[in-house]
Amino acid sequence: MSDAREPADFVEIDWAGRPVNLEYQWVGADTQSAPLVVFLHEGLGSVSLWRDFPQRLCAALGWRGLVYSRPAYGHSTPRAVDERWDVDFMHRQAHEVLPALLAALEIDTTRQPPWLLGHSDGASIALLYAARFPQQLAGLMVLAPHIRVEDLTLRSIEQARLTYQHTDLREKLGKHHADPDSAFWGWNTIWLHPPFRHWSIEDEISAIQCPVLAVQGHDDEYGTLEQIRGIARRVPQTRLLELADCGHSPHRDQPAALIAAIQAFTDAAA
């Protein structure tokens, strides 16, 4: 994201009794009165792996954006070598880390509720935040979300492990993460941990009250369309967008179509 309005910065939060530095970046409109959208990255993502999509979206909407790297990702505090994530790791990001970040940056979610835009694991975290804090969001855009574990997902994550071990994927991730092993193995190990096979947030998301746009590609290698259709069954105000010629990353595969859909969605929700 070298063309961003501001370089990445850092803020310290207290997470479970320990200090954690989070990498973050402001993009888009300078005015505090502009609507705010917070970007939550995928399971191997970071601030820089969004590339220019946050800037493009905020420019189209006239909004300001907050992009951040979760603990263990990007240049945020890495995962300790012996640290293993639990089955509730996405819940903890939604219920603990994201609220702490917003508070540290003095974002008043009661006075001016933000929007969330999440991708993959970040989309699941956004759904969990919206379910826990239903009065503190203006709306939600989720790209390739997970609401339960599918066999397709696990097969692709198993393949990702082989790719990481036997190709130059580690070096490629090293361009975006200070510690690529922290990012990769934290994500890969928990998803392939046998108890995680039963992970589901299908019941929890019924508490969501804000408008929701759920987006998925027809060629998503990490989930079937039942993921977003399952959201629509449980959150009736959900608008679905199923994109052809699109894999797991709609913002990379179909950015123009996605931005147009978000513009229409946010205009209708205003």
Regions inferred by a protein language model and the residue ranges of each:
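Catalytic active-site module of serine/aspartate enzymes centered on a nucleophile-bearing elbow/loop
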Residues: 239, 244-270
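Short beta-strand/loop motif that positions the catalytic acidic residue
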Residues: 208, 214-216
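Active-site loop/oxyanion-hole signature of alpha/beta-hydrolase fold enzymes
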Residues: 67-114
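Conserved hydrolase catalytic core segment
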Residues: 112-150
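Conserved HGGG/HGGXW glycine-rich cap/lid loop of the alpha/beta-hydrolase fold
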Residues: 27-80
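A short loop-to-beta-strand scaffold at the N-terminal edge of the catalytic core in hydrolase folds
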Residues: 17-28
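Acidic catalytic loop of the alpha/beta-hydrolase fold
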Residues: 219-223
